[in-house]
């Protein structure tokens, strides 16, 4: 997003390119008049133009939220072994971009850098006359301009190197297209509800497949979902149901909303090289949208969009139906810090009514509480979202996993879109992307000061805060803790508590362990952090207790029986203080599939 400059300090990509003239300013100059003999005339014919200093940019990006997003994407990139992991966080009410990250990225201070692995890859591909890294026209040009095998290999390496660097420098969020998959079903639902061709109570019986012209389109649940209403159709991510919604709309109305939500145009974000969708290439035109094309488009297949288009559309549902212009520059300042210009939120158009938006938001919340998006659940924050898993066009066996959401569902502040390109093993957005979004949502809303509102069921499962025991007698402290259900370990022979772990007010489980130290110079007890990954909640709790550690659960504890741990806040094998709280992240692999082969 920031981009970089060349050796001449001229912007080459990102904001450095977009705002190069503004950031650089204008050099001063003197214009003199000459007489017929090329001699200088009097000063009265001289014009002096003072230099104008460049302005500085203040971005909408929040460095804390940016770090949350980047850290989470780096983890899922490593775990999924995908080709890339991408994410964006937007203020749903203004269009301001709060965070944007592309993993694998590049070093802004050394944009030409390649890893040893990348260099080896370039060298190997350069020897091939059918390298997948080269287009047919590039290979043809190399063959025409180089006579020897060595020359052609060198030319290939140069082109492949440049291709690889250009790919690194591209901002996937604004410049690349992807297959949105089932996340797009929220658009189909919005259109169907707005046009009154369906209601939340409209029912459909899914048998596991549907016949469209000469094709059989399958649901990811081969045995079918049975009879379900529209809300459960979205929760279950049922393809046949949404095919029928698209067919009820008809091609003309479907295209009208496809266009209204911004999928046929640029969003207008203030970054360079935003991709312009090409009719007939990236999406079906109205003239070419037959029953098959309409049906596949209705559940998010057979067309491509940019991530910035998708999160802008998601934000429109979150904010009551207004399609905003996304932006990253909040204001420009002169050399003295004075505001030269300031970006104002821009509503491009109203795409659906507030009533429809609220209905869809409620349906999306059910996706997270009980549907394919359950791994995006965050206790105390109502999250509304939709999972997506799509097969790449013309690339059988390769997938894009994604999840789009906003929170809090009842009073939205932020929208989050997470995309993993070509994951290995688990391919579903409900498995891969939802936990990432949950972490970003939880940490971001906490940082923003958004207060949690717990349900009665959540209240029963809440962690507690360690009481202040310093200064109490050991006897009184132990009596209080045992009465409250805590386990107690005492270190030292003193009769008063000098310090404790966890410290006062730190988060810990209601039945956790507290260590009481009674001597100032007593050695602190330590514990080795186990590897909690791959365990059930019960197994994690037992292992933590036997290891002398407290556990904070992150995940939908209301569905504890189907949860498996996948990450932890302190690395396995690390030495930490006895009684410290370790956050263990859980997700479900049950009922989160949303893709049919």
Protein language model annotation of sequence segments:
Residues 19, 82-94, 205-209, 273-275, ...:
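Acidic/histidine-enriched alpha-helical segments
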Residues 1-54, 418, 435:
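Small/polar-residue-rich segments within soluble enzyme cores
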Residues 35-48, 93-182, 187-420:
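Beta-lactam-recognizing serine transpeptidase/beta-lactamase-like catalytic domain environment
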Residues 280-282, 343, 380, 385, ...:
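Ligand-recognition elements built from short beta-strands and adjacent flexible loops
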Residues 2-3, 13, 17, 21, ...:
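Solvent-exposed, polar/charged alpha-helical surfaces in well-ordered, non-transmembrane soluble domains
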Residues 72-73, 174, 298, 403, ...:
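Short beta-alpha junctions and helix-cap segments that line functional grooves
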Residues 65, 72-94, 101-105, 110, ...:
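Flexible, solvent-exposed loop/hinge segments and secondary-structure transition points
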Residues 42-85:
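Conserved, well-ordered alpha-helix/loop/beta-strand core segments that scaffold catalytic motifs
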